[in-house]
A protein has these predicted regions:
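Canonical positions in the second alpha-helix
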Residues: 65-66, 99-100, 133-134
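TPR-adjacent "capping" and linker segments in tetratricopeptide-repeat scaffold/adaptor proteins
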Residues: 26-42
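Register position in tetratricopeptide repeats
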Residues: 52-53, 86-87, 120-121
Length: 135
């Protein structure tokens, strides 16, 4: 085989390999752009501000507005859940945190709040699995 033949062979091999791995790229979720992003960011920051100031009803309203604008936000689910967990019913906070962890499984804070809620609901085995995953 000549040098040109070898170079052509290597080039084709690299091209095929690149194509093979290119097909396995993660699908990128659509994100917010333009006015929707501005509205979402404003509502989220106002929700955090209200939460810090102790105005939990307003915070919930702002975070609910965020969910209407973009319902794939794990951060909004976390913030809502961290407020709702202060009540007696843990059903909705548990659902929100399961969804948040599903959206971002490697986020430590989401997993910790999920495990905490599971403990409060006396779902100890499931909470242990979440803690074990964190270790």
């Amino acid at each position: 085989m000549t040098k040109l033949g070898r170079l052509l062979f290597v080039f084709l091999l690299l091209l095929c390999t690149t194509q093979l791995f290119a097909d396995k790229k993660k699908v990128v979720e659509p994100t917010l752009e333009g006015e929707a992003k501005v509205q979402f960011d404003y509502a989220f920051m106002e929700g955090v501000r209200c939460k810090v100031l102790g105005d939990l009803k307003s915070a919930i309203a702002y975070f609910d507005q965020c969910m209407k604008i973009y319902n794939k936000s794990a951060a909004v689910r976390y913030e809502l859940s961290s407020i709702l967990v202060l009540g007696e019913d843990y059903t909705l906070p548990l659902q929100l945190m399961r969804e948040a962890v599903e959206l971002e499984p490697t986020n430590i804070w989401y997993n910790l709040l999920l495990a905490n809620i599971l403990q409060r609901k006396s779902m100890i085995e499931e909470a242990c699995k979440v803690y074990d995953k964190l270790i």
